[in-house]
């Protein structure tokens, strides 16, 4: 009994010492293992020491005379296990956790426990063969993975996001891990019961890696250096070898490290550049290019820079162009967003004749990212420097890539037409359209010629053929019509706006106006995103500028008033941010606002825009002010509040000097025109230098002079009509230097619009004014009172509708004499604008009580 006592509990026993030596030897062999493994070793060592203490010193101090205590001590002796047995127990526990996770389909736990299982079996195989329970576990786990894949493809069971992520990670690791145990797994699957009952276990030979001392680590790189240059050295002094067989493995490591901290992106880029040199097959080059371009874009997301570095952008553009060249020369390799990823890094996929290999990736996304990065850099570069001009020249490279990408995705869509492929074509066509719609025809012609010359001669596009590249209008029309036919939503609306902008830019006012009206974008533009609303504002402004160049002053002022009348032209056109003192804009909103700003070369000249708006307002406001001086009922009518406010401010000045800017020049010209001196007004307006920025400035100035003559005539007639009985047309012709035919046409138009109470005497070639048509003072006051009453009534109705939240029917009464109809009773009343009832009664307006008493009420109704 005493020998057994000392054998089981003594700290100096052979068994205990051998266990201790085994643990210490294990710890020495695994000095450079992971922290998690070392912590597990420490836990095991501490557990053994605790068990030794319990079975050693404490037992030795107990009373040996007690038989019951001796029996308990003997039972405790049987619990003591060696390190190998403990590791096997841990292995079994881990396998049980995996089996439980398989029952509930918890792939996150399976992935974690599988990694732990491999670490545990690595320790066991260092001193013995591979456990059969491990072979059974990994073989069953691989079968379970295959079953899950089959269920996924058949659609019987779908995994959620977290399960799918864990499943993909576990599937790759299991497949890669089981290659090392292929023979044992095959034996297990042939006869599972015989394999588990047999006693022989095959041991996988493990060659211990020789320890490398610090001196050897220092000398190893030197030994790897050739006479020609340097060699890349990895961990442990090993020289990294880049071979065609290792390309996919290197790419796998780079992809898995994406998004992690402390990752050297530049080193990864250099690695992939070396992989390109050793790549032999098209598949290898395509895979490397896809990863390389994505890594270059990641440099911007991980740095503090606002935009991508110019050298990296150009490198990414060259890689993208090379990728397209490889794809064009190898039509059996297709980059497609929905393709499945190739998981076997040991070998490459083989393509049978007539088959197509689909590689996961997106050509259109790369083109869009290049476009976005170029735009972002142009936003942050000072536009008044040579750097901006140099950077803008890169747009030619980008446009060439867009045309090339369009031709590539067109070919894919023609082979097999699907919604994702059609969407890719729409996106790249939209990007191309956004690069040409705002440019003059001459610039587009030069850009198209240079693009097609740089592309391979066999490359062509079915949407915009190479042969028709010289016709700019046909180019824009073809791109827009394609998007009208095959796209919808935002892309279709943006294509419509781009076409309208292009037509207005090239002086086709009526076509652009009709397209804008027929598209109904004015009614639902608020439902689109902010970028589309900005494009809508730009298009609206361009239509107004086109109307002004065509001499359509009223149309120009009416179109520009919505944008220019608000005083927020910069913000509405995305050409600058207005910082207000008490602004409640958050930093995130301000950042988004800055991202929406357009590059400088796409800007519309705001000073020219303001000058055109004020000039158009002057031509309408000055005759109107002269007309209202003798017509009190029209005093409340204002066409442009902005122009009126500027004119009033200028008139309040005691001393007015010569005009110093464009705005002062227009206001001074308006004062001369109101005073009847049209020659000085024309001279002052034509002296503004900003007209030289418009195409054909001489034609514009001639049009302005003619408009001043006509509006000067109208102003003169409005001002002095009460003092004339008749006026000779010949006198007016000499006064305003207009032909008598032109003057007769202007006066006839004024008479037909009831602006002038007169008649043309064609016999005497004169104007005969009618007297007594002006309103008396009492009549003017009655009209003013009626106008105010109507405005008050409308304001009350609007307030009532807001408070009742549109419940207009609750306040309508029966139209019968003295009858009160309940809700739902038959009534003949109509809404505002409906047909009148017999006797002159009109339907009640919804939402309020009808005003219907007295002579004043009758006057208002009339």
UniProtKB/Swiss-Prot annotation:
Biased region (Basic and acidic residues) positions are 55-65
Point to the regions of Acidic residues compositional bias.
17-54, 66-75
GO-annotated molecular function: RNA binding; translation initiation factor activity; translation initiation factor binding
Does the record bear Protein biosynthesis in its keywords? yes
- Please provide, in alphabetical order, the Gene Ontology terms of the cellular component aspect for this entry: cytoplasmic stress granule; eukaryotic 43S preinitiation complex; eukaryotic 48S preinitiation complex; eukaryotic translation initiation factor 3 complex; eukaryotic translation initiation factor 3 complex, eIF3e; eukaryotic translation initiation factor 3 complex, eIF3m; multi-eIF complex
| Domain (PCI) ranges | 600-774
Query: GO biological process: any one?
Result: translational initiation
Keyword Transmembrane helix tagged: no
Question: Which InterPro entries does the annotation name?
Answer: EIF3C, EIF3C_N_dom, PCI_dom, WH-like_DNA-bd_sf, WH_DNA-bd_sf
The record's subunit annotation is: Component of the eukaryotic translation initiation factor 3 (eIF-3) complex.
Report the protein name in the record.
Eukaryotic translation initiation factor 3 subunit C
Species: Aspergillus fumigatus (strain ATCC MYA-4609 / CBS 101355 / FGSC A1100 / Af293) (Neosartorya fumigata)
């Amino acid at each position: 009994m005493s020998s057994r006592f000392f054998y089981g509990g003594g700290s100096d026993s052979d068994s205990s010492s051998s266990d201790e030596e085994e643990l210490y030897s294990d710890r020495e062999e695994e000095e450079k293992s992971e922290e998690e493994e070392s912590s597990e070793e420490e836990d095991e060592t501490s557990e053994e020491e605790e068990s030794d203490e319990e079975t050693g010193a404490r037992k030795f101090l107990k009373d040996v005379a007690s038989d019951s205590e001796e029996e308990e001590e003997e039972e405790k002796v049987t619990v003591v296990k060696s390190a190998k047995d403990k590791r096997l127990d841990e292995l079994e526990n881990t396998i049980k956790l995996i089996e439980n996770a398989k029952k509930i389909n918890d792939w996150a736990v399976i992935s974690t426990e599988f990694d732990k299982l491999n670490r545990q079996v690595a320790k066991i195989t260092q001193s013995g063969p591979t456990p059969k329970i491990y072979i059974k576990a990994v073989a069953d786990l691989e079968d379970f993975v295959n079953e899950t894949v089959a269920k996924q493809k058949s659609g019987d069971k779908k995994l959620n996001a977290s399960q799918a992520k864990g499943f993909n990670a576990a599937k790759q690791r299991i497949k890669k891990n089981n290659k090392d145990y292929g023979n044992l797994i095959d034996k297990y699957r042939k006869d599972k019961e015989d394999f588990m009952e047999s006693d022989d276990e095959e041991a996988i030979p493990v060659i211990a890696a020789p320890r490398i001392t610090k001196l050897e680590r220092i000398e190893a790189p030197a030994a790897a250096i050739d006479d020609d240059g340097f060699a890349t050295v990895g961990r442990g002094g090993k020289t990294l070898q880049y071979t065609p067989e290792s390309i996919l493995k290197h790419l796998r490591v780079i992809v898995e490290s994406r998004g992690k901290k402390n990752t050297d992106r530049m080193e990864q880029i250099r690695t992939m550049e070396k992989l390109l040199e050793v790549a032999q097959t098209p598949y290898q080059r395509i895979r490397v290019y896809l990863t390389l371009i994505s890594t270059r874009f990641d440099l911007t997301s991980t740095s503090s820079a606002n935009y991508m570095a110019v050298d990296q952008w150009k490198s990414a553009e060259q890689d993208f162009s090379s990728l397209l060249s490889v794809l064009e020369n190898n039509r059996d390799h297709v980059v497609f967003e929905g393709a499945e990823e190739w998981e076997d890094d040991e070998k490459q996929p083989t393509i049978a004749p007539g088959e197509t290999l689909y590689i996961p990736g997106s050509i259109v996304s790369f083109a869009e990212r290049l476009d976005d990065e170029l735009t972002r850099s142009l936003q942050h570069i000072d536009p008044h420097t040579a750097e901006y001009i140099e950077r803008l020249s890169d747009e030619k490279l980008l446009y060439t890539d867009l045309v090339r990408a369009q031709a590539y995705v067109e070919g894919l869509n023609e082979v097999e037409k699907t919604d994702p492929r059609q969407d890719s074509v729409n996106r790249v066509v939209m990007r191309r359209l956004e690069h040409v719609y705002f440019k003059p025809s001459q610039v587009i012609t030069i850009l198209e010629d240079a693009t097609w010359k740089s592309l391979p001669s066999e490359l062509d596009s079915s949407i915009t053929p190479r042969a028709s590249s010289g016709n700019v209008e046909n180019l824009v029309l073809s791109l827009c019509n394609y998007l009208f036919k095959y796209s919808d939503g935002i892309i279709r609306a943006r294509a419509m706006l781009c076409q309208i902008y292009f037509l207005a830019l090239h002086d086709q006012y009526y076509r652009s106006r009709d397209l804008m009206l027929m598209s109904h974008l004015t009614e639902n533009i608020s439902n689109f995103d902010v970028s589309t609303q900005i494009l809508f504002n730009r298009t609206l402004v361009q239509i107004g500028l086109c109307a002004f160049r065509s001499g359509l002053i009223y149309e120009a002022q009416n179109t520009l008033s919505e944008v220019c009348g608000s005083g927020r032209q910069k913000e509405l056109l995305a050409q600058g941010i207005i910082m207000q003192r008490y602004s409640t804009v958050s930093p995130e909103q301000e950042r988004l606002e800055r991202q929406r700003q357009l590059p400088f070369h796409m800007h519309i000249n705001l000073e020219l825009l303001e000058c055109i708006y004020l000039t158009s307002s002057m031509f309408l406001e000055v005759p109107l002010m002269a007309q209202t001086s003798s017509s009190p009922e029209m005093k409340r009518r204002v066409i442009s509040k902005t122009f009126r406010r500027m004119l009033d401010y200028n008139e309040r000045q005691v001393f007015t000097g010569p005009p110093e800017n464009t705005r002062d020049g227009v206001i001074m010209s308006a004062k001369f025109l109101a005073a009847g001196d049209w020659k000085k007004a024309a001279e002052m307006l034509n002296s503004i230098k900003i007209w030289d920025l418009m195409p054909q400035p001489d034609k514009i100035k001639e049009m302005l002079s003619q408009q001043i003559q006509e509006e000067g005539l109208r102003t003169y007639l409005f001002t002095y009509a009460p003092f004339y009985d008749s006026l000779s047309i010949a006198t007016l012709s000499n006064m305003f230097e207009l032909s008598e035919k032109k003057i007769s046409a202007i006066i006839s138009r004024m008479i037909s619009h009831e602006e002038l109470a007169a008649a043309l005497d064609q016999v005497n070639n004169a104007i005969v004014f009618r007297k007594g048509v002006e309103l008396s003072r009492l009549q003017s006051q009655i009209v003013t009172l009626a106008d105010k009453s109507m405005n008050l009534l409308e304001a009350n109705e609007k307030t009532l509708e807001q408070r009742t939240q549109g419940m207009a029917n609750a306040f309508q009464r029966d139209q019968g004499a003295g009858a009160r109809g309940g809700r739902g009773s038959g009534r003949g009343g109509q809404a505002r604008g409906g047909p009148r009832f017999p006797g002159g009664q009109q339907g009640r307006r919804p939402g309020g009580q009808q005003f219907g008493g007295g002579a004043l009420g009758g006057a208002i109704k009339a």
